[in-house]
Each structure stands twice: as C-alpha cells, then as structure tokens.
C-alpha cells in the first residue's frame, strides 16, 4: 500500500539538506531519500537573533541528589555567553534561565516550545544543561540519555527517570521544532555521551552541534 504525505518545509537561504526516511510498524527502516535544495532568497535585513536557553540544577526534590556546581556553572555560562554575544553579532539576544526546583520537566518543556514559536531560520539557538543525567535502555535495547529534571525523586528507579526526565529523543524533537538554522546543545551531566549519537543526524543535516562533559 502506498500513501502520499505532504510536508511544508521552511527553507533558509543557500543550500538546504532534505532527508526523508520511512519505517514500518515493526520499526524496519526503508532506505532514506535525500536531496539538496539551493534556495535563492532575498538577503534578510538586519542581523540574526540569538536564543540562549540555560538550565542548571543544584537542588532536587529529593535532597540527597543535590549538587554543588550545576547552577553556578549554568549561571556562569549564561552570563559569559549572554554578555559576549551581545557585542554586535546579533540583532537581539533572548535569554532564558531555569534553575533548581523550578527546572521541572513541564517548565523546561514549556520554554523549548516558546522559543520554537519565536526563532526564525536565520537565527541561532544555544541550549546548555548542567545537572544529573542518566542513560537507560529504550524499547529496542539501545542506550537513551535522559536529562534529569528537578522533580525526579529517584535516580535509581528507571521508570521514575523516564517519566520525569527528558529523553534524548524528546530533545531531538524540540530541536526540530525550533526553526533556528544554527543550533548548539551543551550538556554538563553524567552519562551524556550517549546523546551524541542521537543528535548525529541533526548535526550532519542541519548545522547543529553537540558538546558534552
């Protein structure tokens, strides 16, 4: 059975790399189809905007998981990048910081969605996270990174982490929703190396970058 699906894709000036990939209900992937579209558009007036989103957690709902440097590191990154990048490179710098007990899954998600409605293809988006991280097995037995939000009360319970944390797959989906043509994700969290593979395709196809420590 053949089904035709239509998508509207916003194009940025210059080369745009488009890739389509289908998979069956049993998760068997078809050979991907890809093409390059060279879009000639009027040069946008003015400079791009920067969207800087920082999350740092020292205090968790379960105090035995509290950290010492999550929030200070995030605040330092916010100040350093926010101040430095205001110096002429961007038209506007939009900064959002969520810290400690305010950094719930719901609040973190809400800010991603807010920026997804504001950023334009010519803009730049930077996300920085400092806090706990866990890598668990997904339904196919593959490693999946979870950003541990402040309302996760038990790091040693996989179901609790999956319910209250934000998975690498969710982060990828937020990245796709945010239309900024240049994106960078930085993670200062345990076990965050596994998220690099999850972001590999975006990194290749859309000019995104991921750093982890």
Roles of regions detected by a PLM:
Residues 52-63, 91-95:
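Acidic/histidine-rich, surface-exposed loop or edge segments in extracytoplasmic proteins
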Residues 20-24:
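Conserved structural position at the C-terminal beta-strand
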Residues 14-18, 123-125:
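Exposed beta-strand face motif in extracellular beta-rich ectodomains
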Residues 49, 106-130, 134-197:
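Caspase-like (clan CD) cysteine peptidase catalytic core
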Residues 56, 81, 99, 172, ...:
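Active-site-proximal C-terminal subdomain of hydrolase catalytic domains
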Residues 36-56, 79, 156-158:
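Low-complexity, Pro/Ser/Thr- and charge-rich linker/hinge segments at domain boundaries
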Residues 61-79:
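Glycine- and acidic-residue-enriched helix-capping/strand-helix junction motifs
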Residues 2-10, 28-39, 74, 78-123, ...:
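Functional beta-strand-loop-alpha-helix junction segments that form "active/interaction loops"
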